[in-house]
Amino acid sequence: TDIIVGFPNETEEQFEETLSLVREVVYDSAFTFIFSPRPGTPAARMKDETPAEVKKARFLRLKELIDEQATYTASKFVGQIVEVLFDTVSKKDKTKISGYERHGRLVHVDGDESLIGQIKKVKITSSRTYSLMGEIIDDWRRSSKSWSN
């Protein structure tokens, strides 16, 4: 979702309507921007009397709300098992690999490049605002079945 604040002459009431909608929807994440005019568009020709500092303050309020919602929704994943398609080795830590679960959440686990392109079951152990940490359980499940025989 993309949300733009500071459209020319946006009122506080209009901005509050945006916040109300965001509270109602509860976004996992959103791309938020301060309006910038694009040449050739009707909005680029509009006179704008909303001060830049008001636009920035609104942007920060919106971002804070979306970050709170993202932190909350991410925390609900802790303890769940999700399927993750792995696609990247961490640039900072070569013992970590990352991928996405089916709803687009970024998931980090211990692993290496051999997992790239694979889908694995992962138990989510902790969360951050825009990502999840977990451990692969596919191999554990296979081996645990052999223990019960």
What residues fall within each predicted segment?
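Conserved C-terminal portion of the radical SAM core fold
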Residues: 1-41, 61-72
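Terminal RNA-binding accessory module
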Residues: 45-149
